[in-house]
């Protein structure tokens, strides 16, 4: 078998609908567009959400809420992630988290949460640590340094 001999599996493809090829084809003359009108013209049709002049649903609904421009967005990691990627006695900071592939970019900081178990003594230097995560890190013999 050669590359030019490859064909799709039998029945997996469908022939395209050929429009405007005579009345006998079933899709000749008006090509499935009916007679005249906006939708029969080239580039015809209405934009999404247009309801014929009636006030659209998107404008009938009230506005709600706002975007807090001071909101901080943290990269969230769990204790189990640290267990998997770090050796005993390691220092966990931005650079080391980046090196082991746990973070790609730092948004407003890093927060450690307490899901999973930790058996290694790690020194954790991040922006935020949950109470359960801090307890697990200290119980394993590590230190928490919140920056």
UniProtKB/Swiss-Prot annotation:
Record-stated family: Belongs to the universal ribosomal protein uL15 family.
Q: What does this protein do?
A: Binds to the 23S rRNA.
Among Pfam families, the record links this protein to:
Ribosomal_L27A
Q: Name one GO molecular function term.
A: rRNA binding
| Residue span of region Disordered | 1-62
Keywords from the UniProt entry: Ribonucleoprotein, Ribosomal protein, RNA-binding, rRNA-binding
Assembly state and interactors?
Part of the 50S ribosomal subunit.
Its GO CC terms?
A: cytosolic large ribosomal subunit
Q: Which InterPro entries match?
A: Ribosomal_uL15, Ribosomal_uL15/eL18, Ribosomal_uL15/eL18_sf, Ribosomal_uL15_bac-type, Ribosomal_uL15_CS
Query: Tell me, what is an example of a GO biological process annotation in this record?
Result: translation
Q: Which NCBIfam families match?
A: rplO_bact
Instruction: Provide the protein name.
Output: Large ribosomal subunit protein uL15
| Domain of life assignment | Bacteria
Here the segments flagged for biased composition (Gly residues) are 21-31, 42-52
PANTHER family xrefs = 50S RIBOSOMAL PROTEIN L15, LARGE RIBOSOMAL SUBUNIT PROTEIN UL15M
Task: List the PROSITE patterns hit by this protein, alphabetically.
Answer: RIBOSOMAL_L15
Provide the species name. Answer: Desulfitobacterium hafniense (strain DSM 10664 / DCB-2)
């Amino acid at each position: 078998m050669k590359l030019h001999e490859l064909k799709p599996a039998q029945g997996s493809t469908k022939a395209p609908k050929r429009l405007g090829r005579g009345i006998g084809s079933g899709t000749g003359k008006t090509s499935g567009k009916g007679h005249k009108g906006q939708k029969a013209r080239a580039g015809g049709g209405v934009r999404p959400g247009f309801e014929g002049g009636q006030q659209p649903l998107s404008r009938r609904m009230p506005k709600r809420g706002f975007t807090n421009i001071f909101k901080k967005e943290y990269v969230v990691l769990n204790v189990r992630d640290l267990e998997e990627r770090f050796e005993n006695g390691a220092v966990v900071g931005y650079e080391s988290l980046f090196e082991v592939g746990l973070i790609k970019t730092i948004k407003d900081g890093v927060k450690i949460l307490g899901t999973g178990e930790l058996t290694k003594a790690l020194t954790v230097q991040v922006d935020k640590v949950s109470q359960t995560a801090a307890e697990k890190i200290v119980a394993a013999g590590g230190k928490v340094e919140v920056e």
